[in-house]
Amino acid sequence: DAKMKDLLNSLAFGTNLSSVLIVVATFLVLWLLKLDNWMWISCSVVVGLIVGIVIGRSTEYYTSQSYRPTQKLSESGKTGPATVIISGIGLGMLSTAIPVIAVVVGIIASYLFAAGFDFSNVGLGLYGIGIAAVGMLSTLGITLATDAYGPIADNAGGNAEMSGLGEEVRKR
């Protein structure tokens, strides 16, 4: 009998494990390619990966029922629908701050890492930004797989319910 928290922890573990494997693979592949600045380019990938994780955690914080922003939004519904609308718009605007700041810092850091902290090396700096985007999207596969789990499980439960099976089937 798994609890929701156990399932979410398992999904988070899978994402974290894939992130670690991506970091190891990045450093190994770029080292094997024997590039002059393989370490700095690898750091740009890691910066992108960190930015992706920060965006994901920020999204979870502002949208999960387990955290204060959504709890506070639901409490605002006690005073009427207008309060919910105003609070929701404000919360939506506030929730974009962390991802935007993370992307800006990530762009600057990945540029500097790939360029070797040399502002005149524009080509390599721009490559660093591009490779950081690859790092940011590198966990997309497992993230989409974990996001797809919820609707699939819900549909399976609905099918079990419509077919007249017992409540124990729905709980499984």
Ranges and model annotations:
Residues 1-172:
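Hydrophobic packing and interface segments
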